[in-house]
Amino acid sequence: MSNFLPIPTKAATPLPSFAKHLLDYISAHFRDTHSEAFRKDVDVLVGMRKDWVEAKLEAHPEIIRAFMRYHAQLAFLSTKFPSDINLPFAYYLPFPATFSLSPDAPISLSSLTFERACVLFNMTALYASMAAAERRAEAEGIKRALGYLTAAAGVLEYLITSVLPTLRSELSSPQAAGYDMTESFLGTLKEFVLAEAQECYWQQAVLQGTYKNGLIGKLSMKVSEYYKAALASMNGTDYPSSSYFPLNWTAHMNVKQMHFEAAAQFRLSQEDLEKSRYGEEIGRLKVAESLAKKGLDAARKGVADSVVSDLKQLHAAIKSSLERAVRDNDLVYVQPIPPANQLAPIVGVGMVKVNVPAEVAEPVAWLMGGKAGMEPLFSGLVPYGVHLALSIYDDRKDTLVRDLDGKREELDGLAASTLQSLNLPGSIQALDRPVGLPPSLLKKSEEVASSGGIERIRSLLDEVNRLAHANVQSLNEAMDILDQEATENESLIARQPELQQTRQPSHVANQPLIQMAEQYEATIKQAGGSDATVRAKWEEWARLVGILAAGEMEMEDYVPGTTSPSGSLPPSVRPLRASLEELDDRIAHRARLVREARQISAADDIRPEVLKEAAKLAHGGSGDVKTEWFEDLFEKGLEKYMGVKREMDEEVAKHDELLEQIRTQNESFLSERKDDPIIKERERRLQDMDLAYWKWREIVDNAEEGIKFYNSFAEMLHGFKAACGQFLNTRRIDVGQMTTQFQQQMNVSEPQQQPEPRYQSPSPQSFQPSFSPSPSHFQPSAPSSFSSSPVRSPAPSAPARRESPPKTLSFLPHPSSSAWQPASVDFLPPPPPPPILRSGGIQSQPKVAPPVTPSITAIRDQTQGTPRRMTRAAAAAAERDEATERNKYSSGGPRRKGGGVV
C-alpha cells in the first residue's frame, strides 16, 4: 500500500445543452457569421468534454494529455467569447462535507474561467494519483513519481497565479466558487505535492546508499518543512481551509511532518556519532524519539497502515540507538548532553523545482503551434476583444451624436422659451393675417399629427408607467430574497444556538446590500416624482395639443378671426419677421447637422481596420486582444465627426446674437403697435397653438428619456437581484461549512482552538453594479429647455453580459418553507418605502411567549422596529381580531349574513 495520498477529482455534471447553447450564442452575438459554419467545431468541443471531463476519470498520461488539449481549447475560446456566456458549469467538491445539509450539491457558475480552473484541478489530481500508484522500490518508479508530482505542483502554481485571480474578479465573494477554489486550499495542495516530491528525492538518496547521513538528514528536514508549510496554508488567516480536509488528511500531514523531522534528527545523530559528538548524538536522539512518539499518537486518526508502519520502524531504530548511546556515554564517554534548544538547527536542502508544463503555461501558443495534435476551434470567429473594442468605439460615436442632439435640443428650447416670453410669433401673425392660420402653424400641426399626436404621448407615458412598476417589482423581489435569508438565519440559530458565536447576523452580513437597496429606492422615488411632474404637464396641455393635432378646421374654430382693418403694418414688423425666419432656418440647420451626424454614424464601420490591427498586434490572434491597442484608430475614426461638431459649436454664438437681436426688434415693434382687443385675443390663441407644439415636443422628449432611464435602471436592479441571490446561496453553503467544522471539533478528542468565522460579509464593492443611471435623466425641463439631458449610456459591455441572466450558484437546496412559515402563507407585496430595512433580520433572539394574534396597529408598530414583512394571512387575522375588539356586540347574539347585529 502506498504511503502517498491521491488527490480526489472534481466530478463534472453533464451539459446536454452545451452544443445548442454555443450555436445560439454565436447566432446572437457574432455579426456576419452563421452558426452552422461552426457546428463541427462545436461538436468537437462538446465531444471532448463528454469523453474526458464528464466521464469517470482514470489516472493515465493520455487522459492528462486530453485534459491539456481541452484546457488549451478553452483558453483559446476565451479570446473569442466572454467568460460568462450564460451557460452554467457545475462541479462537485472534492471532499464533500460529512455533516453538510446536502453534501452532494454541486457548485454551478456561468463562467468559462471556472471551467478552466476545474479542469486544471482535475489535472493536478490525476498527476498526484499517478504518483501515488507508482511503485517506488526502484529508481525508475521514483523518477516517474517525481515527474508527476513536480508537474502537479506546476499546474497548481499556474492555477493559483494565473487563473484564480481572474475567477475571483468574476465572483461576488471569494468562496462563491467553492472552498477548493481558494488560495488557502490550493496552496495546501501545492505544498503537499511538493513535500511528496521532496520525499522522492530523500527516498532515492536512501536507496542509493552513497550519500552521507548529514545530507540525507537535510533532505529529510526539507520534507518536514514542506508538510509544515502545507499545514500553515491550511490554517491561514484569510479563509482557512483546515475544516474542509478530512481528518485523515490532516493527520497524515501531521504524522509525515513529525516523521521526517524525527528522521532528520536521527540522521544527524548518526553523523554526530561518526564525529565522536556523543552528547549531541544523545540530544538529537531524544528529540527524534519525542517527535516519533507524537507522530504515533497522531497516527491513530485514520492514517494509512503503510505510513504508521514506516514511523514504527523509525521509532524502533531511534529507541535502539538511544539506549546504546546512553549506555556507552554513561560507561565510556561521559559527555554532557545539550538540551534541545542548544542543538544546531538543521537547515533543509530542497531539491524540488516547480515544473509548469508548457502545455499549461502557454496553452494558446501550444495549440497554435500544432503540438496539440489538433487545430484550434472557432478560429474563424472574431476575437471577443475585437467585439469589445468595436462596442467601445460605437459607444463613443453614439455619445458624440447624442451630445450634438442634446446641444440642438438645448438651443431649440432656449429659442422656444425666449419667443414665449416675447409673445412671438403670435403678435406678428395676428396683425399679418387677420383671418386664417399662418403657414408655419399649419406646418407644426402637420408634424404633430404625422408623429402620432396625443396617442403617441399616451402610449409613451403608459410605457413609462409600466417600466416604473416593473422596476419596483424587481427591487421588491430582491428584498424578498434578503427577507428569506434573514428568516432562514433566525430559524437556523433557533435550531443550533452554538452557531450564533461564529455566524454573522443577517442585519450585519447584508448591510452593504441594504444600503444599496436604500439608494435604489431613493432613485425610484425621485424618478416617480419626475414622472408625476411630466404627467401633470401633459394634463395641462393635452387639450391644446389635441386641437393642434386635429388639423386646420379645429384650429380655426379655436383661433378667432378679425375683419377689422389693420391698416398698414408698423415699419418694425419687416425686420422682426426676417429675424424670426432666420431663427427657423437656424433650427432647421441644426436638425440637419444632427441628421448628418447620424448618417455618418450609420455608415461608420471600422471593423476591417480593427481586425487588421488586431491581427498585426496579436501576431495572428495567438493571444488576448487588448482594447487599448486601438486608441489611435478610434481617434482617427472620430475625426469624421469633427466638421459637424464645429458647425454646431458655431451655432451657439450665432444663436445668442440672433435672440438678442429679436428682443431689440420686438421692443421697437411693441412701441409702434396699436392695441386691439380682438387682435389681442387672436394673438394669444395663436401663441397658445405655437406653445402647444413646443410642449408636445418637450413631453415626448421627457417620456423617451424616462423609458431610457428605466431600461438602464432595470439592468442594475437585475444585477442587484442576482447579487442578493448569490448572497443567499453563499450564506446557505456557509451553514454547511460551519456545521461541518463544529461537528469535527466535537469529534476531535484533543481540545482545539475555536476557529474564527470564515464567512465575511461581502464588501459594498462586491455587489456594486458597473453603472448608475440617475432619475435626473427623466426630469421635466423648464420652459427654457424642453428636453432633459440625454441619458448616459451604460458602460460598454459584451452583448452576452448585457442580455444574459446573472451568475447563479446552486450550493445547498432551498430549506423547507415549513421551517419558518406555514405552507399556505403567501407574502404580501412590498411595504411602503420607509421600512426598507426590513431585511436586517432580528438582532437578538426573542423571548418565548404564548402565541398571540397581534392587532393591525401592533403589527405596524412591530414592522417599524423589526424589518420583517407581514404575510397576507397574518394581516387578515389581525384585521379580524381588531374588528372584533372594536365591536362591543361581537360576543353577543348571532349575526346576519349581511353583517348587521341582531
Swiss-Prot record:
Gene3D superfamilies: alix/aip1 in complex with the ypdl late domain (1.20.120.560), alix/aip1 like domains (1.25.40.280)
Feature: compositional bias, Low complexity: 757-799, 866-877
UniProt biased composition (Polar residues): 744-755, 854-865
Gene Ontology CC entries for this record: endosome
Region (Disordered): 744-902
GO biological process terms, semicolon-separated: regulation of protein import into nucleus
Domain of life from the UniProt record: Eukaryota
InterPro entries assigned: ALIX_V_dom (IPR025304), BRO1_dom (IPR004328), BRO1_sf (IPR038499)
Composition bias type Basic and acidic residues, residue spans: 878-888
Positions in coiled-coil regions: none
Domain BRO1: 3-415
Family: Belongs to the palA/RIM20 family.
Subunit note: Interacts with RIM101 by binding to its YPX[LI] motif.
Record function comment: Required for the proteolytic cleavage of the transcription factor RIM101 in response to alkaline ambient pH. May act as a scaffold protein that recruits the calpain-like protease RIM13 via VPS32 to its substrate RIM101.
UniProt cross-references to PANTHER family, sorted A to Z: PCD6 INTERACTING PROTEIN-RELATED, PROGRAMMED CELL DEATH 6-INTERACTING PROTEIN
Protein name (Swiss-Prot/TrEMBL): pH-response regulator protein palA/RIM20
Organism, as annotated: Cryptococcus neoformans var. neoformans serotype D (strain JEC21 / ATCC MYA-565)
